[in-house]
Amino acid sequence: MSVLLLRFAAPLQAWGSSSKFDIRTTEREPTKSGVIGMIASALGIQRNAENADDELKKLNEMRFGVRVEKEGKLIKDFHMVRKIENRKMTASYITDRYYLSDAVFLVAIESDDTELLKKIESALQRPVYPLFLGRRSCPPTLPACRYYPHFPADRLRRVTAAQ
């Protein structure tokens, strides 16, 4: 087994799993789908590409875990958007968007495919598309990646986010 460790820190993060329409919630820690989305962005996988399903399937097969380094604070943002057509306002949309403020997480991605983990590490250091921690308004602070071949899972308890 090989493990790639990712440190997620930012002023704001949002990890939605069931948000719809007017209320955009966030989970209290990163979701696997959110992390896979960020990795797919780094790798340059386009949703409508022919091989996108195969690439995403490979990413989904990886094992995933999160350690909370700093919980952060749940905050709510009142958000209003106005739609304008032909120089006239036609509608206003009001939503509540929830974020985690100043949270820090250590995310572990485990796979038997060491080449895939190396490819992900390289892509996260030089992403094809911008990286976000859940939403576009949540860019990470200098994402740190570390690749650990044959990393025993019990050692994860001793790894600090600062390493």
What residue spans do the PLM features occupy?
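Residue-level recognition of well-ordered beta-strand positions that form the cores
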Residues: 7-9, 65-67, 108-110
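Generic beta-strand structural signal
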Residues: 4, 62-64, 103-105
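N-terminal, Lys/Arg- and Ser/Thr-rich interaction peptides
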Residues: 1-22, 33
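Glycine/small-residue-rich interface belts in oligomeric ring/scaffold proteins
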Residues: 17-86
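Residue-level detector of functional hotspots within protein domains
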Residues: 1, 7, 50-52, 64, ...
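A generic structural signal for short, non-catalytic loop/turn and secondary-structure boundary residues
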Residues: 1, 57-61, 100
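Internal, well-folded beta-alpha domain core
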Residues: 69-163
